[in-house]
Amino acid sequence: MTAYRLSATKSRGRTADFRELRAGKLGVRMASTAADIDAAQALRYRVFYEEMGAAPGPDAASSHRDRDEFDAVADHLLVVDHPIGPGPESVVGTYRLIQRGGAAAIGRFYSADEYDLGPLLRFPGRILELGRSCVDARYRGRAVMQLLWRGIAAYVAQHGIDLMFGCASLAGTDPDAIASELTYLYGHHLAPPALRARALPDRYVDMRRMDPLAVDARRAILALPPLIKGYLRVGAFVGDGAVIDRPFNTTDVLIVVKTDLVTAKYTKHYERQSRGTPD
């Protein structure tokens, strides 16, 4: 069994100035304790393994936690339902955020297991990997996703992030079953060469599954998972090639977002909150 040591000491140093953002009974904040991170891992286990049917390894099966070595070097964004109280059940949404320094401590970013990140690593600005995004089934809807995006915008502003990236998943492991979605993404949202990470050779799945002229763009967009549609709304690109993730029963694509393309409403909302100005 693999043991992962949890410590929020480094995270507290990075996120001490992050002020919780509220929307009614919900709030978005950074994890500041080991218990916070454990609650995020428990939520991830419920969503990824119990709900979506991912195949757990020995540690996940025994601990009922989705956890790995990257958790210790990441910042964890949490959506909290305050009326539930201070316990782990109050964490209803989460995102894992990894900067260059955290990745250096491990020796790689998480996405490097699927993609050659060379073009992104050569990017001269500050980069941030987004991952392990999930929301409790009872809370899936606009409110929680809006809060998560507001939290990301706040974090980006606080840390001067210039580029975000990370894997996003489509359900299933048959790329031909999602041929229109993959072909649409490749044809309409392929990253420019300077930012075009490519799936590793032994994992590369061509996204051009059909004649681009035969793709109904509107239907393809509607068929995309909400998370990917959200990324596209803030100007996301995709890398070259999809990757089959059989343990998680998904097909992954790499998302790349230049933060100067992020829809202004999130940043402007955060700035208004910081000034104490109502929406």
Residue ranges and their predicted role:
Residues 1-23:
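Short acidic N-proximal helix/loop "leader" segments that mark the beginning
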Residues 97-237, 242-255:
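Acyl-donor binding region in acyl/amide transferases
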Residues 17-101:
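Short amphipathic alpha-helix that is part of the acyltransferase structural core
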Residues 9-16, 48-58, 177, 205-210:
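Short, positively charged
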Residues 273-279:
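Short, cationic low-complexity segments
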Residues 243-244, 268-271:
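Composition- and surface-driven signal marking solvent-exposed, interaction-prone regions
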Residues 261-269:
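Long, contiguous binding/interaction regions
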